[in-house]
Amino acid sequence: MSNPRVFFDMSLSGTPIGRIEMELFADTTPNTAENFRALCTGEKGMGKLGKPLHFKGSIFHRVIPGFMCQGGDFTAKNGTGGESIYGAKFKDENFIKKHTGAGILSMANSGPNTNGSQFFICTDKTSWLDGKHVVFGQVVKGLDVVKAIEKVGSDSGKTSKVVTITDCGQLS
């Protein structure tokens, strides 16, 4: 079975800026990859928090240049929420893959075994996160879109424009 590919169509304050295509590492992190894939398609319907389990319409709430772009909080939209397809937080699957450079897709968390729906895309090598955050995919097309998002970030993570996932889904 080949690894699934998913996409985000992105906008900055309502202006479309392009598509990010990502390969999910189902071969090494099947549970984490499946969570992200299903949140891209929205196929699981409503979550326990009463919000659709879907990234569509959610924002990248934290963008730090030279580090990462973080999103996936489709419940509170500020970094305090989110929900996995498994209901609760789920365990760190493994730390086989490393934060080797720009385009790495990894789970955001608040400590060990606290994965939900929040994720980040690295804009540089972030090796200090190895062993703490689960790497489960990589950008295969649209790194220029990630770099455009990075440009509206700040040292505090606050963005100068609203960074929105206007559409998302599975390609293969």
UniProtKB/Swiss-Prot annotation:
SUPFAM superfamilies in the record: Cyclophilin-like
InterPro entries noted in UniProt: Cyclophilin-like_dom_sf, Cyclophilin-type_PPIase, Cyclophilin-type_PPIase_CS, Cyclophilin-type_PPIase_dom
Function as written in the Swiss-Prot or TrEMBL entry: PPIases accelerate the folding of proteins. It catalyzes the cis-trans isomerization of proline imidic peptide bonds in oligopeptides.
PANTHER family for this protein: PEPTIDYL-PROLYL CIS-TRANS ISOMERASE, PEPTIDYL-PROLYL CIS-TRANS ISOMERASE CYP18-4
Oligomeric form and interacting partners: Interacts with A.tumefaciens VirD2.
GO biological process: protein folding; signal transduction
Induction: Down-regulated by salt and cytokinin treatment.
Species the sequence originates in: Arabidopsis thaliana
Compartments (UniProt record): Cytoplasm
Superkingdom classification of source: Eukaryota
Regulation: Binds cyclosporin A (CsA). CsA mediates some of its effects via an inhibitory action on PPIase.
GO molecular function: peptidyl-prolyl cis-trans isomerase activity
Listed GO CC annotations: apoplast; chloroplast; cytosol; Golgi apparatus; plant-type vacuole; plasma membrane
Family as reported in the entry's similarity comment: Belongs to the cyclophilin-type PPIase family.
Gene: CYP18-4
Protein name: Peptidyl-prolyl cis-trans isomerase CYP18-4
Residue stretches making up the PPIase cyclophilin-type domain: 7-170
Distribution of this protein across tissues and organs: Ubiquitous, with higher levels in roots and flowers. Confined to vascular tissues. Also detected in stigmas, base of siliques and anthers.
Keywords: Chaperone, Cytoplasm, Isomerase, Rotamase
Entry's EC annotation: 5.2.1.8
Record's catalysed reaction(s): [protein]-peptidylproline (omega=180) = [protein]-peptidylproline (omega=0)
